[in-house]
C-alpha cells in the first residue's frame, strides 16, 4: 500500500479517536465506556447489598429471605420482638453520629439529578446503605430497592466528581447507575432502563437512552453471573378467562388507587408529625419502630423485612381472603411505623406486597360473584401488584415492565396495563404524582412540572438583575454616551 494511503488511514483513525473521546456532554466513546464502568460498579453494589441482607437475615432469624415468613412463625415470641428492636437500636446509634439523622433514598437521587448537578454525598450513601442492611436484615418492614438505587447513584456521583464531568454527562451517568442498580436487583434490564429514564432523568432521548441501556446490561450481567438468571417470583402461568373481565380490571385499578392514596397519606402524615416525633431522642426512635414491627409480626410474620415470600404465595393463590385483607392493613401500618421511626423506607417492595394482597382479595371476591367468568385470584394478584406499584411510584411504564420481568408472565399484559393506567390517573386526582414527589414537596421542592418549571418558579428577578452598569446624565451628548 502506498505511503500516502497509510498516512491518510492514520489521520482518519486519529480524527475518529479524537471525535469519539472528545471532552464534552455527548462524547459517545467516553460516555459508552463510563456507562459500562458505572453499570458494573452499581451492579456489584446492588448484589453486594442483597447478599449482605440475606446473610444477616439468616443470622437473625435462621432462615433465608425466601422462607422468612414461614420460618419466623415458628420462632419464640421474644425472638420476634428482640431482633427488630436490636436492629433499630444499632441503626439509631449509627444515625446519632450522622449529620442527616436519617437514611436517604430515591427522592434524593431525583433531587440531585434535577437541581443539584448530580451531587450526592458519598458518606450519606454509605451510611444509608449500612443502615438499610442492618434494618432489612433484622426484619424492618421496608424495601431494599430504594436503598440499592441510592447506593448505585451515590457511587456514580463519586465517579463523575472524580472525573470532573460536566453536569449533562454527569446526569446521564447518574441514570446509568440507577438503571444498573434496578436491573441487578430485579434481574430486569428493560425495566431498569425505563425506571432511570422515567423517574430520574425525566425524559427520553437517544443520547441518553444508549448509555443507560449499556449500563443496565452491565448490571444485569453482573447479577446473573453471581446470583443466577431467574425471576424474583415464581408464579403459575395464568390466562385471562374472558374479555368480560376487563371491567373488573378497570375497577381493580380504581380500588388500587384508593389504597395507594391511603398508603401515601399515611407516610406523608408522619412527615407532618415529624416535629412531635422528634421530641423522642433520635437514637431510640428506630428501636421503638423495631419493637412495634416485632409486635405486629407476632400475629403476622409475613410483614417482616421485604416480604417476598408472602408476595410470592399471594401471586400463586395460596392465601385465603381471611388472611389477605388483614395483611393489606398491617403492611401499611408497618411501613408507616418504619418511616416514622427513621428506618428509611424503600416503597417498591411494600407496594408490591400490598398490591398482591389487594389483587388476590379482589380476585377471590370476583370469583365468588362470577365463578364462570373470573380468572384465578393469582392473576388478579399480579394485576393488583402492578396497579398499586404504578400509583405509588408514579412510573407506570417502568413498573409494568418490572412486573412482567419479575414474574416472566406476559399473558396478563393487557390486564396489568389497564389497571396500572387507571390507578395512576385516579391517584393523580387526589394526590401527588408519586411518593417521591411527595417527599420532595415536603422539602419545599416541587418538580411536578419538571426541572425547568421548578427553577423558573424558584428564581427571583433580583438573581438575574445586573448592577454592573454605567450611568450618564440625561443632558449628555450622543458622542459622550458613545465614549
Regions found by a protein language model. Name each.
Residues 1-458, 462-483:
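Alpha-helical transmembrane segments and immediately membrane-proximal extracytoplasmic
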Amino acid at each position: 500500500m502506498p505511503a500516502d494511503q497509510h498516512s491518510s488511514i492514520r489521520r482518519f483513525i486519529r480524527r475518529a479517536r479524537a471525535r469519539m473521546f472528545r471532552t464534552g456532554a455527548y462524547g459517545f466513546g467516553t460516555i459508552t465506556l463510563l456507562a459500562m464502568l458505572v453499570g458494573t460498579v452499581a451492579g456489584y453494589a446492588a448484589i453486594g447489598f442483597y447478599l449482605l441482607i440475606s446473610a444477616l437475615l439468616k443470622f437473625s432469624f435462621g432462615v433465608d429471605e425466601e422462607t422468612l415468613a414461614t420460618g419466623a412463625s415458628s420462632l419464640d415470641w421474644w425472638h420476634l420482638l428482640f431482633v427488630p428492636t436490636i436492629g433499630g437500636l444499632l441503626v439509631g446509634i449509627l444515625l446519632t453520629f450522622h449529620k442527616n439523622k436519617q437514611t436517604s433514598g430515591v427522592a434524593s437521587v431525583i433531587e440531585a439529578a434535577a437541581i443539584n448537578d448530580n451531587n450526592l454525598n458519598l458518606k450519606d450513601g454509605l451510611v444509608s446503605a449500612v443502615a438499610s442492611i442492618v434494618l432489612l436484615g433484622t426484619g424492618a418492614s421496608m424495601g431494599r430497592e430504594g436503598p440499592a438505587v441510592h447506593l448505585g447513584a451515590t457511587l456514580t456521583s463519586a465517579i463523575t466528581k472524580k472525573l470532573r464531568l460536566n453536569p449533562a454527562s454527569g446526569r446521564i451517568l447518574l441514570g446509568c447507575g440507577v438503571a444498573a442498580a434496578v436491573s441487578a436487583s430485579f434481574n430486569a434490564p428493560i425495566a431498569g432502563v425505563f425506571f432511570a429514564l422515567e423517574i430520574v432523568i425525566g425524559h427520553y432521548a437517544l443520547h441518553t437512552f444508549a448509555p443507560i441501556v449499556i449500563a443496565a446490561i452491565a448490571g444485569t450481567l453482573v447479577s446473573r453471573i453471581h446470583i443466577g438468571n431467574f425471576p424474583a417470583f415464581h408464579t403459575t402461568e395464568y390466562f385471562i378467562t374472558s374479555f368480560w373481565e376487563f371491567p373488573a380490571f378497570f375497577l381493580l385499578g380504581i380500588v388500587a388507587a384508593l389504597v395507594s392514596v391511603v398508603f401515601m397519606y399515611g407516610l406523608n402524615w408522619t412527615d407532618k408529625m415529624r416535629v412531635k416525633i422528634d421530641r423522642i431522642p433520635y437514637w431510640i426512635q428506630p428501636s421503638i419502630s423495631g419493637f412495634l414491627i416485632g409486635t405486629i409480626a407476632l400475629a403476622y410474620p409475613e410483614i417482616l423485612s421485604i416480604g417476598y415470600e408472602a408476595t410470592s404465595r399471594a401471586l400463586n393463590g395460596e392465601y385465603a381472603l381471611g388472611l389477605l385483607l388483614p395483611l393489606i392493613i398491617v403492611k401499611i401500618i408497618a411501613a408507616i411505623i418504619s418511616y416514622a421511626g427513621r428506618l428509611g423506607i424503600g416503597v417498591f417492595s411494600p407496594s408490591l406486597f400490598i398490591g398482591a394482597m389487594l389483587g388476590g382479595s379482589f380476585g377471590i371476591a370476583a370469583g365468588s360473584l362470577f365463578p364462570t367468568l373470573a380468572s384465578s385470584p393469582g392473576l388478579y394478584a399480579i394485576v393488583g401488584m402492578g396497579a398499586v406499584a404504578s400509583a405509588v411510584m408514579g412510573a407506570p411504564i417502568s413498573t409494568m415492565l418490572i412486573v412482567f420481568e419479575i414474574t416472566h408472565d406476559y399473558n396478563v399484559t393487557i390486564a396489568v396495563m389497564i389497571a396500572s393506567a387507571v390507578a395512576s390517573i385516579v391517584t393523580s386526582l387526589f394526590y401527588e404524582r408519586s411518593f417521591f414527589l411527595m417527599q420532595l414537596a415536603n422539602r419545599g421542592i416541587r418538580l411536578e412540572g419538571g426541572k425547568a418549571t421548578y427553577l423558573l418558579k424558584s428564581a427571583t428577578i433580583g438573581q438575574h438583575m445586573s448592577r454592573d452598569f454605567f450611568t450618564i446624565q440625561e443632558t449628555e451628548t450622543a458622542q459622550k454616551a458613545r465614549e
